[in-house]
Amino acid sequence: MLKIDILPLGDYQTNCYIAREENSQSCAVIDPGYMPEQVLQFAEGKGLCIDVILLTHGHFDHVGGVKTIAEKTGCALWMSQADWSQENTQENAFFYPIANCDFAPVNFCEEGQRITAGDATFTVMETPGHTWGSVCYLCEDAIFSGDTLFAGSCGRVDLPGGDWNTIQTSLDRLAGLPGDYKVYPGHGEYTTLERERKMNPYIR
């Protein structure tokens, strides 16, 4: 059974998720935000070993803590190549600052790829639209949706990399997943996929 701890961090209350299999000390950190010391202190307090950082996208409020955590733990880092490539342009440096981080090599994830943290396995689902390379991570009955899908809403598309038609396609893909999932978004309260199918005005 997957155990999930939620740390809302910073002025933007970005949800950092620490996910692991019950009775396992190896965990994944999904979107560490930009307050890395809080993440590290939480993990240390629980006796957890951070195996991987999984980034749903490259916006600064989700990635600011990556360098510190990666340096102190030696963990692997996964994100989409599409967001990484766009981060390497000057005009996008504010929104996508991760390219300025000189930490260990980035691993680029792709649709359907399976990434492990201890006994937990996360499957990559490409969901562009909020950014060029936004992804969700599925693990058991959980979806870590980043800024693609929120409770009752969806991610904004007016920043570099945003596109309404693209995010609509991604939302349709999420809604079309079989069965129900708990949805853990980048901001705000968690929800369920079934609830969003019924109540979310952005899901057709």
Model-identified regions with their sequence ranges:
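Conserved beta-strand hairpin/beta-sheet module of binuclear metal-dependent hydrolase folds
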Residues: 1-46, 136-146
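Conserved Rossmann-like nucleotide-binding pocket used by diverse enzymes
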Residues: 5, 54, 123
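Short Gly/Pro-enriched turn/cap motifs at secondary-structure boundaries
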Residues: 7-9, 105-106, 126-128
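A generic "binding-loop/recognition-motif" signal
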Residues: 12, 35, 59, 83, ...
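Active-site neighborhood of phospho(di)ester-bond hydrolases with catalytic His/Asp-centered motifs
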Residues: 29-30, 51-58, 77-80, 126-129, ...
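Active-site HxH/HxHxD metal-binding segment of metal-dependent hydrolases
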Residues: 34-117, 198-202
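Metallo-beta-lactamase
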Residues: 92-95, 121-126, 131-204
